[in-house]
């Protein structure tokens, strides 16, 4: 069984220590009552992987681990087969001892769009909401973060994360918890909170923004990446049954409307820093994700539209700040 005790020990003497009042019981309940039918199979694949210590580890420019001498062909094939038992791989890519996990998404492209606009991550404690298999958390560590905590209830993603961690030398600077944000108390302890690719899946997007704010320390930075549509501050698309074949898409605002929502929730210094149409080069079917992908979700006659006739996916990045309080300012002045 995946062991979370290292994380509990790590936060016991940190600003996250009050999370221990609820977190162990939540994780124990998940382990007892909520495991996916294939979880044991996925977990066994992780258990059979060797714990390798990289001779060269690059998390700044990619997620790449290399050994001093190449693995034998048989050893490499065994690792690759175990990793393929954890398909589909959606977020990446990873290069692990000569095994290239070519994921559905080029998440490195998103990171390169986001990174120039971030406050320096050096020494920061970070929360990544809806973190998937944890690719961006490793990039956050590469950019100097002290600790990256991801939450995502999808259990396959947890096993993929643990597999990668094991091949990175059991690195304890990043941790993934199988929770949704609605299960977190108001921790108010993270220097930076990321929510990328989550907002449009929420039935109540403003509640999600408040939940993100509740996790930030005063003066902390929110990094929000989500689907948007063209339009002014009054423009919001509410799709019917599906959007790009996804059933669980509820609200897609314009970037201007989203900026107004953030300000309504009390964020300051709200900035739209990037907008980019998602291409079929960035999201596509691969050897590691063999089912339908973006090309199947767009109108074959007009790729500016989804198969349902809505505008094709356009993603914006917005940066915002949680205001300081008198108490936080006084503490910093000491």
Swiss-Prot record:
Residues at which carboxy-S-adenosyl-L-methionine binds: 91, 105, 110, 130, 152-154, 181-182, 196, 200, 315
GO molecular function, one term: methyltransferase activity
Catalytic activity: carboxy-S-adenosyl-L-methionine + 5-hydroxyuridine(34) in tRNA = 5-carboxymethoxyuridine(34) in tRNA + S-adenosyl-L-homocysteine + H(+)
InterPro entries in alphabetical order: CmoB, Mo5U34_MeTrfas-like, SAM-dependent_MTases_sf
This enzyme's EC code(s): 2.5.1.-
Keyword presence, RNA-binding: no
Subunit structure: Homotetramer.
Protein name: tRNA U34 carboxymethyltransferase
Organism: Klebsiella pneumoniae subsp. pneumoniae (strain ATCC 700721 / MGH 78578)
Phylogenetic placement of the source organism: Bacteria, Pseudomonadati, Pseudomonadota, Gammaproteobacteria, Enterobacterales
């Amino acid at each position: 069984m995946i062991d979370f005790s290292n994380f509990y020990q790590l936060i016991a003497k940190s600003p996250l220590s009050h999370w221990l009042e609820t977190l162990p019981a939540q994780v124990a309940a998940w382990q007892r009552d909520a495991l996916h039918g294939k979880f044991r199979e996925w977990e066994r694949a992780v258990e059979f992987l060797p714990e390798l210590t990289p001779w060269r580890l690059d998390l700044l420019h990619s997620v790449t681990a290399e050994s001093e001498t190449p693995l034998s062909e048989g050893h490499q094939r065994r690792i690759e087969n175990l990793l393929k038992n954890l398909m589909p791989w959606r977020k990446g890519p990873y290069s692990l001892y000569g095994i290239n996990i070519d994921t559905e998404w080029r998440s490195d492209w998103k990171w390169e769009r986001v990174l120039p606009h971030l406050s320096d991550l050096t020494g920061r404690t970070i929360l990544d909401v809806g973190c998937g298999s944890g690719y961006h958390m490793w990039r956050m560590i590469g950019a100097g973060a002290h600790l990256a905590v991801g939450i995502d209830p999808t259990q396959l993603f947890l096993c993929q994360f643990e597999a990668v961690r094991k091949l990175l030398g059991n690195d304890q600077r990043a941790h993934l918890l199988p929770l949704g944000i609605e299960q977190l108390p108001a921790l108010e302890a993270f220097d930076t909170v990321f929510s990328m690719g989550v907002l449009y899946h929420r039935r109540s997007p403003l509640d999600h923004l408040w939940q993100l704010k509740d996790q930030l320390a005063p003066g902390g930075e929110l990094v929000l990446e989500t689907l948007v549509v063209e339009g002014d501050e009054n423009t919001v698309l509410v799709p019917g049954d599906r959007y790009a074949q996804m059933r669980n898409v509820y609200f897609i605002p314009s970037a201007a409307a989203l900026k107004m929502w953030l300000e309504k929730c009390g964020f300051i210094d709200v900035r739209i820093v990037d907008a980019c149409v998602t291409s079929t080069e960035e999201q596509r079917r691969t050897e590691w994700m063999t089912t339908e992908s973006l090309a199947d979700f767009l109108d074959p006659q007009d790729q500016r539209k989804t198969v349902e006739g809505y505008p094709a996916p356009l993603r914006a990045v917005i940066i915002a700040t949680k205001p300081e309080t008198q108490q936080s300012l006084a503490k910093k002045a000491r």
